[in-house]
Amino acid sequence: MKLTILGTGNATVTECYNTCFVISDDDRHFMVDGGGGNTILHQLKAAGLNWMDMRDIFVTHKHIDHLLGIIWMMRMILQNMNRGKYEGEATIYGHEEVIRILKEMAGEVLSAKEMKYIDDRLHMVVVEDGEECEIMGKKVTFFDIHSTKAKQFGFCMQL
Protein backbone atom coordinates (compact mmCIF):
# COMPACT_ATOMS: atom_id res chain seq x y z
CA MET A 1 0.00 0.00 0.00
CA LYS A 2 1.17 3.49 -0.81
CA LEU A 3 -0.19 6.89 0.22
CA THR A 4 0.33 9.73 -2.27
CA ILE A 5 -0.44 13.21 -0.97
CA LEU A 6 -1.70 15.46 -3.77
CA GLY A 7 -2.30 18.50 -1.59
CA THR A 8 -2.16 19.61 2.03
CA GLY A 9 -3.54 23.13 1.91
CA ASN A 10 -6.75 24.66 3.17
CA ALA A 11 -9.48 26.32 1.10
CA THR A 12 -7.65 29.53 0.24
CA VAL A 13 -4.11 28.37 -0.48
CA THR A 14 -2.25 29.83 -3.44
CA GLU A 15 1.19 28.23 -3.09
CA CYS A 16 0.10 24.59 -2.83
CA TYR A 17 -2.98 22.49 -3.58
CA ASN A 18 -5.99 21.70 -1.42
CA THR A 19 -6.02 18.59 0.75
CA CYS A 20 -6.51 15.36 -1.20
CA PHE A 21 -4.68 12.06 -1.58
CA VAL A 22 -4.58 8.67 -3.26
CA ILE A 23 -4.18 5.27 -1.61
CA SER A 24 -2.64 2.77 -4.03
CA ASP A 25 -2.25 -0.98 -3.91
CA ASP A 26 -0.29 -2.13 -6.97
CA ASP A 27 -2.37 -0.93 -9.94
CA ARG A 28 -5.52 -0.11 -7.92
CA HIS A 29 -6.16 3.38 -6.59
CA PHE A 30 -8.60 5.04 -4.18
CA MET A 31 -8.71 8.82 -4.50
CA VAL A 32 -9.97 10.88 -1.56
CA ASP A 33 -11.28 14.35 -2.41
CA GLY A 34 -10.34 16.32 -5.48
CA GLY A 35 -9.22 19.70 -4.31
CA GLY A 36 -10.61 22.92 -5.71
CA GLY A 37 -10.31 22.65 -9.49
CA ASN A 38 -8.65 21.25 -12.57
CA THR A 39 -5.23 21.38 -10.93
CA ILE A 40 -6.15 17.90 -9.67
CA LEU A 41 -5.17 16.65 -13.13
CA HIS A 42 -1.73 18.28 -12.82
CA GLN A 43 -1.26 16.98 -9.27
CA LEU A 44 -2.02 13.42 -10.35
CA LYS A 45 0.37 13.67 -13.30
CA ALA A 46 3.13 15.23 -11.16
CA ALA A 47 2.75 12.32 -8.72
CA GLY A 48 3.13 9.82 -11.55
CA LEU A 49 -0.52 8.80 -11.43
CA ASN A 50 -2.86 8.57 -14.41
CA TRP A 51 -6.30 10.10 -13.85
CA MET A 52 -7.78 7.18 -15.83
CA ASP A 53 -6.62 4.81 -13.09
CA MET A 54 -8.72 6.54 -10.41
CA ARG A 55 -11.62 4.07 -10.43
CA ASP A 56 -12.77 4.62 -6.84
CA ILE A 57 -13.19 8.16 -5.51
CA PHE A 58 -14.51 9.32 -2.14
CA VAL A 59 -15.65 12.89 -1.48
CA THR A 60 -15.70 13.76 2.21
CA HIS A 61 -17.89 16.86 2.10
CA LYS A 62 -19.34 19.67 -0.01
CA HIS A 63 -16.75 22.42 0.51
CA ILE A 64 -15.40 23.64 -2.84
CA ASP A 65 -11.79 22.90 -1.93
CA HIS A 66 -12.70 19.20 -1.77
CA LEU A 67 -15.45 19.00 -4.40
CA LEU A 68 -14.59 21.03 -7.51
CA GLY A 69 -11.69 18.83 -8.58
CA ILE A 70 -14.16 15.95 -8.68
CA ILE A 71 -16.23 17.79 -11.31
CA TRP A 72 -13.07 17.86 -13.45
CA MET A 73 -12.51 14.16 -12.83
CA MET A 74 -16.12 13.49 -13.81
CA ARG A 75 -15.68 15.58 -16.96
CA MET A 76 -12.56 13.68 -18.00
CA ILE A 77 -14.09 10.28 -17.23
CA LEU A 78 -17.41 11.01 -18.95
CA GLN A 79 -15.87 12.70 -22.02
CA ASN A 80 -13.54 9.77 -22.52
CA MET A 81 -16.34 7.25 -22.00
CA ASN A 82 -18.29 9.09 -24.70
CA ARG A 83 -15.26 9.02 -27.04
CA GLY A 84 -14.70 5.31 -26.44
CA LYS A 85 -11.34 5.97 -24.77
CA TYR A 86 -12.28 4.99 -21.21
CA GLU A 87 -12.90 1.32 -20.62
CA GLY A 88 -14.84 -0.10 -17.71
CA GLU A 89 -16.46 1.73 -14.85
CA ALA A 90 -15.69 4.15 -12.03
CA THR A 91 -17.40 4.86 -8.71
CA ILE A 92 -17.72 8.06 -6.70
CA TYR A 93 -18.74 7.64 -3.05
CA GLY A 94 -20.13 10.34 -0.78
CA HIS A 95 -22.96 11.10 1.59
CA GLU A 96 -26.31 12.10 0.07
CA GLU A 97 -25.61 15.85 -0.02
CA VAL A 98 -22.27 15.42 -1.82
CA ILE A 99 -23.71 13.05 -4.42
CA ARG A 100 -26.72 15.33 -5.01
CA ILE A 101 -24.49 18.39 -5.50
CA LEU A 102 -22.14 16.53 -7.86
CA LYS A 103 -25.05 15.29 -9.98
CA GLU A 104 -26.65 18.75 -10.07
CA MET A 105 -23.39 20.48 -11.00
CA ALA A 106 -22.59 17.89 -13.65
CA GLY A 107 -26.08 18.30 -15.09
CA GLU A 108 -25.48 22.02 -15.48
CA VAL A 109 -21.99 21.95 -16.97
CA LEU A 110 -21.64 18.65 -18.85
CA SER A 111 -23.35 17.59 -22.07
CA ALA A 112 -26.21 15.12 -22.34
CA LYS A 113 -23.84 12.84 -24.30
CA GLU A 114 -21.61 12.69 -21.26
CA MET A 115 -24.35 12.59 -18.63
CA LYS A 116 -25.83 9.40 -20.08
CA TYR A 117 -22.96 7.45 -18.49
CA ILE A 118 -23.80 8.54 -14.94
CA ASP A 119 -25.25 5.62 -12.98
CA ASP A 120 -24.53 3.35 -15.97
CA ARG A 121 -20.71 3.33 -15.93
CA LEU A 122 -19.90 6.19 -13.57
CA HIS A 123 -21.63 5.09 -10.40
CA MET A 124 -22.58 7.75 -7.87
CA VAL A 125 -22.93 5.86 -4.59
CA VAL A 126 -24.54 7.41 -1.52
CA VAL A 127 -22.94 6.06 1.66
CA GLU A 128 -24.46 6.14 5.12
CA ASP A 129 -22.87 6.42 8.54
CA GLY A 130 -21.46 2.99 9.42
CA GLU A 131 -21.91 1.58 5.92
CA GLU A 132 -19.33 -0.93 4.75
CA CYS A 133 -18.20 -1.79 1.25
CA GLU A 134 -15.18 -3.26 -0.51
CA ILE A 135 -12.72 -0.97 -2.29
CA MET A 136 -9.45 -2.29 -3.75
CA GLY A 137 -10.26 -5.62 -2.13
CA LYS A 138 -10.27 -4.02 1.33
CA LYS A 139 -13.16 -3.53 3.75
CA VAL A 140 -14.00 0.18 4.02
CA THR A 141 -16.33 1.61 6.66
CA PHE A 142 -17.68 5.13 6.16
CA PHE A 143 -18.61 7.28 9.15
CA ASP A 144 -20.04 10.70 9.95
CA ILE A 145 -17.40 12.79 11.74
CA HIS A 146 -20.15 15.08 13.15
CA SER A 147 -18.56 18.27 11.85
CA THR A 148 -20.32 21.48 12.88
CA LYS A 149 -19.38 23.27 9.61
CA ALA A 150 -20.92 20.87 7.09
CA LYS A 151 -21.93 17.24 7.01
CA GLN A 152 -18.64 15.41 6.58
CA PHE A 153 -17.70 11.76 6.36
CA GLY A 154 -14.47 9.90 6.92
CA PHE A 155 -13.59 6.27 6.37
CA CYS A 156 -11.62 3.43 7.86
CA MET A 157 -9.91 0.95 5.53
CA GLN A 158 -9.03 -2.44 6.93
CA LEU A 159 -5.56 -3.33 5.68
PLM regions with names:
Residues 1-159:
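Binuclear metal-dependent hydrolase catalytic cores
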